[in-house]
Amino acid sequence: MSIPGLGQIAPQAPTTTQRTINLRPFGEWRFSIPHQHSTFSSNSSAAGVTVRLVAGTAERDGTELAPNCVYTFLPGTKSKLFTDQGCTLEINNTGGYPLEDRVVEHPPEQSPMLSYINLHFGLQDHERAAAAQAQQQHPTHHQQQQQGRGAGAGVARSKPGPRVLICGPPGVGKTSLAKLLAALATRMGSQPLVANLNPTDGLLCLPGTLGAAVFGTLMDVEEPAGGFGVTNTPISGPSAVPVKNPLTFYFGHEKVEDDVDMWRQMTERLAVLARRKFERNRDVRVAGLLVDTAPVEAGDKEGQELLGWAVRQFDANFVVVLGSEQLKTELGQRFASEKTSFEEPITVLGLDKSDGAVQIDKAWRQKSTETAIKEYFFGGIKARLSPFTQSASFDELVVFKAPDEPYEGAPVLERVEITPEMAHWTLAVMIASVTDSPQAIRFSSVLGFIVIADVDQERRRVKFLSPVSGRLGNHPLIWGRWPEPYLNLLA
């Protein structure tokens, strides 16, 4: 059937979303992609904003982009691409995301990146000095045989590489600097140990945790956390980049001040394990340590006291203060007379924050937390995972919880009954036994996480989501106070 006039309607030209950006040396392309809304399907072929490096060099937080390779940046990403030599980028937003972006170009001498790169080279000098001392005090097995010495000879304690603690007020780019220094170190063949003491941001794990991991391989530039996210850990399938194996403690709170005593004890425990890593792995010992911390402002005496605690526990010999000259002055006075266990002075360095660093608002952080939980169980765009829905009786699960209001003499954990209030909460599965003491369970490392999907009080059964099949065995669970149950993963 013919409809008059229909054939005269000209076909609508497709809207082009592709554009080209030219950056001069030390230029940046800064971008923000809002978190995914229901109008955008994660199954769409246009899952995010794609970027291709056409010419020149570019990097994200120290990790280089390969030429002519298409990178997809996903919703929930706030970041930048930097070039030290100049580059041409091809940007494509066929998914129609409300992309916010701009080009920023500084003269090299005015770019904060110059000071960050200079810091990296300064740390490399200390690493080379540590390597030379380690080589002298700990010859290789072949060298020992040539010198007629036994394999156990030369075990004198050598000085490790630089131990750097990064601090500053909120929104100055502390985590971005930690990523940058870690990525630049790995590009030089180093294997630094990176530790996170800020429970608001999990390192290779869910928020609400403290942890550490060795970074000796390429970091994932595409994922929203830029190499520090949960998708960079081992999964049941192929991975686009080499995975990292974090050591994680479950803090269970959003902020350090929610339980300062617990934070101190976990920081001390993490530092002990870091020293053991130094003792067992020569390459890590030489590369040193990067410690990312929770926000601390000038005049915050309690926060600065906690920084001092972390400096002493990790034996840091460099304290990098971002974005606050006053805080740098106060910490310089605090550490002026202190030395490390190797009789090194504690050097306090002040660096300007990038004018692109912004403070993350509560709504964005909440969506980021939800996304991290989803990706832990279901994977991301590049690697889909299929979690297992399991059912167990109340008697099969042993759940502990920290007191809601910590008080002097309070137990670190109390065993609790399973209740409907647990629905949609994320519980930590501990590397411990249900017969261990509450103290041992609390300070055990994390095996993984489950989400309580439903609690049937009448039948005394609980349904939960787990990344692996099989029973939990005698592993105890800890029910924290954060992350809160924002969503129903099985909805």
Swiss-Prot record:
Signal peptide: none annotated. Residues 130-148 have a biased composition (Low complexity). It comes from the Eukaryota. It is found in: Nucleus. ATP binds at residues 28, 78, 171-176. Residues 128-160 are annotated as: Disordered. Coiled coil: none annotated. GO terms for cellular component: mRNA cleavage factor complex; nucleus. Keywords: ATP-binding, mRNA processing, Nucleotide-binding, Nucleus. One of its GO terms (biological process) is tRNA splicing, via endonucleolytic cleavage and ligation. Belongs to the Clp1 family. Clp1 subfamily. HAMAP family: Clp1. Component of a pre-mRNA cleavage factor complex. Interacts directly with PCF11. Required for endonucleolytic cleavage during polyadenylation-dependent pre-mRNA 3'-end formation. This is mRNA cleavage and polyadenylation factor clp1. It comes from Neurospora crassa (strain ATCC 24698 / 74-OR23-1A / CBS 708.71 / DSM 1257 / FGSC 987). The gene is paa-7.
